Amino acid sequence: MNENAETAHATSPGSAPAAAYAPSPSDRVRDQVARYEATAGAEGGELGGLPVVILTTTGAQSGITRKNPIMRVVRDGVYAAIASYAGGPQNPAWYYNLLAQPYATIQDGPQARRVRAREVLDDEKQAWWDLADAGNPNYARYRATSGRDIPILALEPADWADEVG
């Protein structure tokens, strides 16, 4: 598991208190998340001219809440979290966080949605790639240069009660 895996989520009413939020050590990520949240997505809602949403996860090892902008890829209310890491050789930390704790939050503009992550494979994964490629011309290059099979997680709507029930 990635030793830097540290991302998080808020908890439901009546459950354990939310983990402390630790902003990203990356100035770009930290500033983008702060602008996005302060303006309900009116600012900080793009990266390289492409739309993003804010993914809030729980650190796999630390339990600390982390927030990251990810590309906005959505179909029928389900979001895709594409672990491309801009074509880097490793998966982003949030990917490992979602494997360890699949409940997360997506903020899409002013709307925050509770989601549950599940890795997609085969034909379902290809369908997500087709949608993602149509909106982001960089993904094909990332797949060609990363040297790895880039994972995709479907972020499906979840209810707070799902986590405690």
Task: Map each language-model feature to its residues.
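Residue-level detector of beta-strand face positions
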Residues: 54-56, 105, 154
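Short hydrophobic/aromatic beta-strand or adjacent loop that forms the aromatic wall/cage
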Residues: 52, 149-152
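Short, structured beta-strand-loop surface elements
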Residues: 7-18, 85-139, 145-149, 157-159
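Charge-rich, low-complexity terminal tails
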Residues: 153-165
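Extreme N-terminal tail/first-helix region
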Residues: 1-48
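Short secondary-structure boundary/capping segments
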Residues: 44-45, 71, 96
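Short beta-strand segments
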Residues: 49-84
